[in-house]
Amino acid sequence: MNHGYRTIEFLGLTFNLTNILMITVASVIVLLIAILTTRTLSIRPGKAQNFMEWIVDFVRNIIGSTMDLKTGANFLALGVTLLMYIFVSNMLGLPFSITIGHELWWKSPTADPAITLTLAVMVVALTHYYGVKMKGLKEYSKDYLRPVPFMLPMKIIEEFANTLTLGLRLYGNIFAGEILLGLLAGLATSHYSQSVALGLVGTIGAILPMLAWQAFSLFIGAIQAFIFTMLTMVYMSHKISHDH
């Protein structure tokens, strides 16, 4: 289970090619889904358009549960993109992984803490940006001193805690799922070196647990995409609302 990653050095920085590949694959898949489901918009939508409209309505309901929809409409595209991108990213490593030599080339990008924490930092940074944009820097800064000024240290700690939990929750769930799938796959193939019969027994014994865990991982991947999107909108609501 200990695999390395192909890296390159550029301008003194180290880049993980596996992560770059999987981020690109996830982005292309989401882009293709968006294009294919919206290229022929009609008053009488087909299955593809219905699918995209369902996603948009689902995200609109998420936003509506956290803030006024008139304001929240500004974040509909963000919510749809986050939900689709994270779900697709969660699913990429579910059916299989690809290892060449001792280097892992195909996995879920969200099974890497660097990616999930980067997503979390970007989201939290966006909430601060829109907070300042919609309330003004002076009014936004006062929120950190409310209801009493000595809450400032606690609110700063809260910002770091929100960022860490948002990123690490997603990473932990997806990474754990891929680890267990890898262990079950190893169980299915580990006994062939001893005998074909023993190997077949191991394979048959591992098939049902693998199928069950893949189904559960599909559910977990969807739930984690929902939670990430929901919390993004909750954090956004806290930053732009005049009640906070």
From Swiss-Prot:
Gene3D superfamilies: ATP synthase, F0 complex, subunit A. Pfam families: ATP-synt_A (PF00119). The chain crosses the membrane at residues 17-37, 75-95, 112-132, 170-190, 221-241. GO terms for molecular function: proton-transporting ATP synthase activity, rotational mechanism. It comes from the Bacteria. Keywords: ATP synthesis, Cell membrane, CF(0), Hydrogen ion transport, Ion transport, Membrane, Transmembrane, Transmembrane helix, Transport. It is found in: Cell membrane. GO terms for biological process: proton motive force-driven plasma membrane ATP synthesis. InterPro entries: ATP_syn_F0_a_bact/chloroplast, ATP_synth_F0_asu, ATP_synth_F0_asu_AS, F0_ATP_A_sf. It is a multi-pass membrane protein. GO terms for cellular component: plasma membrane; proton-transporting ATP synthase complex. F-type ATPases have 2 components, CF(1) - the catalytic core - and CF(0) - the membrane proton channel. CF(1) has five subunits: alpha(3), beta(3), gamma(1), delta(1), epsilon(1). CF(0) has three main subunits: a(1), b(2) and c(9-12). The alpha and beta chains form an alternating ring which encloses part of the gamma chain. CF(1) is attached to CF(0) by a central stalk formed by the gamma and epsilon chains, while a peripheral stalk is formed by the delta and b chains. The F(1)F(0) complex interacts with SpoIIIJ and YqjG; YqgA is found in the same complex. Belongs to the ATPase A chain family. PANTHER family: ATP SYNTHASE SUBUNIT A, CHLOROPLASTIC (PTHR42823:SF3). Key component of the proton channel; it plays a direct role in the translocation of protons across the membrane. NCBIfam families: ATP_synt_6_or_A, PRK05815.1-4. This is ATP synthase subunit a.
